[in-house]
C-alpha cells in the first residue's frame, strides 16, 4: 500500500477564473462583482494556488490479468466502504485521472493537462508522452533537475519511541511544492513473531556472553550494557503486542519530495521539512545517488525502489492515517 499526499500548484489563471461569479443581468451584478474582487484578493494573499490532495495506491500479485482485475475491483470496493465508515469521501480513479496526477507531479507549475484516448492511435504516441516532463537530469548526488526546476528526495529516519499524529499534518502545512509518500508493506504474522523470537534469542546469547565476561573479569554479572538491556525489554514488549493485542508488524518507507524554482529555494524547503522532522525527534536525510529511484518511488504507482525501511506496529502506522477534514470549494 502506498499513501501519497501532494501539495501542488494549479494554473493561476484558471484557478482565478473559478472564483468569478457570472453576472445575471439583474440589480445584484454589482454585489457579485464586488464579492468576486474580494475572493480574488484573498486568493492573492492566501495559499498561493496550492491544492492539497491525498491518494491511496494498492498493488497485488496475481497469476493473470483477469484474476488481478477481479481482486483489485473487490479490494477497491472494500476500501471505499472503509473510507465511508471514516466519514471520508473517496472514489476509484480511472486511467485519465491517474495520468493527470502524474502530469501534475512532472509539471509542478500547474500546466493544464490535455489528453484524449482517441489521440493515441493517429499520433503513434503513448500515454507516457503526454505526462513526461520536458527534461530530467540526475547528474548530482543529492538533487535532480525537472523541467528547469530543482528537486530532492529525502527519507524520514524514525528515531522517536512514540510517534505523533501531528507530524504528517505539519509536513503538509508548508506552502511549497511537496509530495509525501508512505510505502507500507505488511509482514505475515507468523513470520513476524518468528523473527522477533530469533532477535530475543540473539540478545539472550549476547547477554550470556557479557555475563561470562563479567565473571572472568571479577565484577558483578548483573551489570550489563544499557543498550543490551533496553533492546531486550523492547523486543519482549513488541512480542507481547503481537501475541496479545492483535497488533500486526509493517515495514514503512517514508519519502519526502521537494521541488523548487532555484537551488536556494530548494535548500530552504528541505531545511523547513527537516525542521518538522526534528520537532518530532526524527531525522530527514537526503538520498545519496538514489534521487532517480526516489523520484520513481514518489510517483503514486505502488513501486518502492528505496529499501530503507522501519518496522512499525499497527498502532504506530495508524498515526499516519490521513485526517478526514476536507477543504470545501465551490466554483462560480
Segments from the language model and where they lie:
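Extended, folded cores of ATP/NTP-driven motor/assembly subunits in large transport
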Residues: 1-328
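Glycine-rich phosphate-binding P-loop
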Residues: 332
Amino acid at each position: 500500500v502506498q499513501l501519497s499526499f501532494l501539495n501542488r500548484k494549479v494554473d493561476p489563471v484558471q484557478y482565478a477564473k473559478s472564483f468569478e461569479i457570472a453576472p445575471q443581468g439583474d440589480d445584484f451584478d454589482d454585489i457579485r462583482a464586488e464579492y468576486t474582487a474580494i475572493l480574488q484578493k484573498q486568493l492573492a494573499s492566501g495559499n498561493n494556488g496550492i491544492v492539497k490532495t491525498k491518494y491511496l495506491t494498492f498493488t497485488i500479485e496475481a497469476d493473470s490479468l483477469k484474476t488481478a482485475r477481479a481482486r483489485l475491483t473487490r479490494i477497491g470496493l472494500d476500501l471505499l466502504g472503509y473510507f465511508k465508515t471514516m466519514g471520508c469521501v473517496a472514489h476509484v480513479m480511472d486511467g485519465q485521472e491517474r495520468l493527470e496526477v502524474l502530469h501534475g507531479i512532472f509539471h509542478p507549475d500547474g500546466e493544464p493537462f490535455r489528453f484524449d484516448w482517441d489521440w493515441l492511435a493517429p499520433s503513434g504516441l503513448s500515454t507516457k508522452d503526454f505526462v513526461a516532463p520536458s527534461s530530467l537530469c540526475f547528474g548530482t548526488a543529492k538533487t535532480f533537475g525537472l523541467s528547469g526546476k530543482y528537486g530532492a528526495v529525502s527519507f524520514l529516519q524514525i528515531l522517536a519511541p512514540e510517534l505523533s499524529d501531528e507530524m504528517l499534518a505539519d509536513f503538509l502545512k508548508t506552502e511549497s511544492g511537496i509530495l509525501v509518500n508512505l510505502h507500507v508493506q505488511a509482514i505475515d504474522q507468523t513470520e513476524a513473531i518468528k523473527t522477533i523470537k530469533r532477535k530475543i534469542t540473539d540478545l539472550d546469547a549476547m547477554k550470556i556472553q557479557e555475563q561470562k565476561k563479567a565473571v572472568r573479569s571479577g565484577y558483578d554479572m548483573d551489570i550489563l550494557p544499557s543498550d543490551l538491556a533496553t533492546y531486550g525489554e523492547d523486543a519482549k514488549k513488541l512480542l507481547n503486542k503481537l501475541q496479545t493485542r492483535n497488533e500486526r508488524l509493517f515495514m514503512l518507507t517514508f519519502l519526502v519530495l521537494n521541488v523548487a524554482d532555484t537551488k536556494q529555494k530548494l535548500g530552504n524547503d528541505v531545511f523547513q521539512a527537516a525542521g518538522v522532522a526534528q520537532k518530532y525527534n526524527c531525522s530527514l536525510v537526503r538520498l545519496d545517488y538514489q534521487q532517480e529511484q526516489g523520484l520513481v518511488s514518489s510517483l503514486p504507482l505502488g513501486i518502492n525502489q528505496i529499501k530503507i525501511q522501519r518496522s512499525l506496529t499497527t498502532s504506530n502506522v495508524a498515526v499516519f492515517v490521513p485526517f478526514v477534514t476536507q477543504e470545501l470549494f465551490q466554483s462560480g
